[in-house]
Amino acid sequence: MKVTFITGNKHKLSEAEKIFHDTGIELEHADLGYPELQGTLEEVARYGAEHAARIMDGPVIVEDAGLFIRALKWFPGPYSAYVQDTIGNRGILKLMENVEDRYAEFRSAVGFCAPKSEPEVFLGVVKGRIGTEERGTRGFAFDPLFYPEGMDRSFGELSTIEKNRFSHRSRALKKFAQWYTENYEVI
């Protein structure tokens, strides 16, 4: 069965295509903007999926993700895209100067909705820490700052295949794929 991924982010699309490759889910793409509520990742994903399903008149997924840093009271959280666009990685590093507690989580919420149905949300989390400098040129956004638990390389130093083994987005998309293949006829 086809599902349309609503995103303007080519990196997210590439990650999703690789994850769905062997699932039987045919992923289509539409760069359709949708209003993002000022709320939790789950609320944004739920609303975005429902809104997009009505407009597209078909099953859709949306994804919202954020970097949550414990020492910064879980900032930037759901405001990660705005923070990335304004202060960027250098701004995060500046906020983290002389901070010992470097614990952070990347969280992802994948929202699914089909016309005339209630939206479903699937969560993925990966724990790690914020480095003291940017490392790596792969990935996007905060990837060069984030070191997954037990690794000495940042997300920015990992290939998409390596990152997809355990990233927050991969975990949320895999939960969705399992649910979707069990609840919808996959052709």
From Swiss-Prot:
Q: What class of enzyme is it?
A: hydrolase
Superkingdom of the source? Archaea
- Which residues of this UniProt protein bind Mg(2+)? E36, D64
Co-factor(s): Mg(2+)
Catalyses which reaction(s): XTP + H2O = XMP + diphosphate + H(+); dITP + H2O = dIMP + diphosphate + H(+); ITP + H2O = IMP + diphosphate + H(+)
Enumerate the UniProt keywords alphabetically. Answer: Hydrolase, Magnesium, Metal-binding, Nucleotide metabolism, Nucleotide-binding
| Gene Ontology biological-process annotations | nucleotide metabolic process; purine nucleoside triphosphate catabolic process
Catalytic residues in the record: D64
| Binding sites annotated in the UniProt record for substrate | T7, G8, N9, K10, H11, K12, A65, F140, A141, F142, D143, K163, H168, R169
Quote the cofactor binding remark: Binds 1 Mg(2+) ion per subunit.
EC code(s) of this entry: 3.6.1.66
For this chain, the family text in UniProt reads: Belongs to the HAM1 NTPase family.
* Subunit-structure text: Homodimer.
Supply the name of the protein. dITP/XTP pyrophosphatase
Classification lineage = Archaea, Methanobacteriati, Methanobacteriota, Methanomada group, Methanobacteria
